[in-house]
A protein has these predicted regions:
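Nucleotide/phosphate-binding site architecture used for ATP/NTP-dependent chemistry
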Residues: 1-415
Length: 418
């Protein structure tokens, strides 16, 4: 796999892998710099005669360490050190007996492939977008904040793996690339539509959804056949399944293709957002994102309904009055398809989530995981940039502005939750 060019000494994708490794192992050492100008290093032994050393730009008490690449392979019997790229770094670490354990060769090879692919995917998105400085320069709205997570999980060896998406599918469907796309629509015999909706009955909820997102298709929505929105990739996947093909053959399901408003994938990839719809929607997506296939379960969508009903109780309302700035995006509806035997197929499930920003899509919004991610260029994170803007706006020292930000976060988020 060809390595992509990137800023000298900075590799946030490799950083995720290494920080996960250091969190889960204990035989590494922190070596202080040999002079005031020299960087500290992580010393990671491979054997009695070899080790990897990685210079540190920052050693974090919370384990969010920042490295200065390349890493070096060193031998115990001489002073020579050899610069190594990320692919070789991974191979050397996975060959270590205590890491390899009793894992079969094919398991290790699959893991190594996912790590390398995730590394490449991360840099493909960063280099395609070229907008990190723009993201960092100003407050973000919901759409921008949800698509600002370019690095991924800070403690995962392959945070940007996405099997079986190919390159074209990844660019169309993943938030890393800031895409938008229309939904795909099925017209389904209502006997094969399962679901619930709290404020509106399910038929009315789906009708409103279609009217706001694909009004040109409303002629297909009748008393007996309902329009059901689908993630385009998942729709194609479902149409390959025997149970879905049976519905098509029986005339109980018609594929109407893609139509209507363009939706954007949020940071979770399977949840989609459109400024013009009262609902967001979270789909089952039969794709291995990070390390798990993202399909919903009936148990999960019904749990969302229970929480939405809880939000209508006097106890919840009292909590809301006590913390008026706290709002929860309730998943107060769901839908899915039943096969010819009447069984709900979980691969077809979707949760309908109240769009609290329907009237105010440009409201400043923060996504904590995006705020806290390491900057691809090695500079300020989005959180550090937000604190600097606060410092400038209030004419406060940066340290005091940081305390103000954390206090506001505690007051608005942590206190209501805990």
């Amino acid at each position: 796999m060809v390595s992509l060019p990137r800023p000298a000494a900075t590799d946030v994708a490799a950083q995720c892998f290494l920080n996960a490794l250091l969190r889960e192992t204990r035989d590494w050492q922190l070596l202080p710099g040999t002079s005031p100008q020299a960087l500290a290093q992580i010393h990671y032994p491979l054997s009695d005669t070899q080790a990897i050393r990685i210079p540190l730009r920052y050693f974090s008490p919370t384990q969010h360490h920042h490295y200065q690449f390349p890493a070096y392979l060193v031998a115990s019997d001489n002073d020579r050190q050899e610069a190594i790229d990320f692919a070789r770094l991974v191979d050397l670490i996975l060959a270590k007996p205590s890491v390899r354990g009793k894992l079969a060769d094919d398991v290790l090879a699959r893991f190594a492939r996912r790590v390398r692919e995730s590394h490449q995917h991360t840099w493909q998105a960063i280099e395609l977008r070229h907008d990190w400085n723009t993201l960092r320069a100003q407050p973000l709205n919901f759409a921008e904040a949800e698509q600002a997570l370019l690095v991924g999980h800070a403690f995962h060896p392959a945070p940007k793996s996405h099997e079986p998406f190919d390159k074209t599918e990844a660019r169309r469907y993943l938030p890393d690339f800031a895409p938008r796309f229309p939904l795909r629509w099925f017209a389904v015999n209502k006997a094969h539509v399962a679901g619930e909706s709290l404020a509106l009955d399910l038929r009315t909820r789906l009708l409103r959804f279609a009217a706001q997102s694909a009004p040109a298709l409303l002629a297909h929505f009748t008393d007996t056949r309902w329009l059901v929105p689908m993630h385009p990739w998942q729709a194609a996947y479902l149409l390959e399944q025997p149970w879905c093909q049976q519905l098509v053959e029986r005339g109980d399901l018609t594929d109407l293709g893609e139509a209507g408003a363009h939706w954007l994938p949020t940071s979770s990839s399977r949840s989609l957002y459109s400024e013009t719809n009262n609902d967001m929607v979270k789909f089952s997506l039969s794709v291995r994102l990070t390390n798990s296939v993202r399909t919903l379960s009936v148990k999960e969508v019904k749990r969302g309904m229970r929480l939405a009903r809880l939000a209508q109780t006097s106890r919840w309302q009292a909590l809301q009055a006590r913390y008026p700035t706290m709002r929860v995006m309730q998943e107060d509806g769901w839908a899915g398809l039943r096969d010819a035997q009447g069984d709900i197929q979980e691969e077809s499930l979707m949760a309908l989530r109240v769009n609290l920003l329907f009237d105010t899509p440009d409201t400043q919004t923060n996504v904590l995981v995006s705020l806290a991610q390491a900057a691809p260029d090695g500079g300020d994170s989005l959180l550090a940039s937000a604190v600097r803007r606060l410092s400038h706006r209030l004419n406060l020292p940066p340290e005091q502005a940081a305390r103000c930000w954390v206090q506001a976060y505690c007051d608005r988020v942590l206190l209501p939750l805990f």
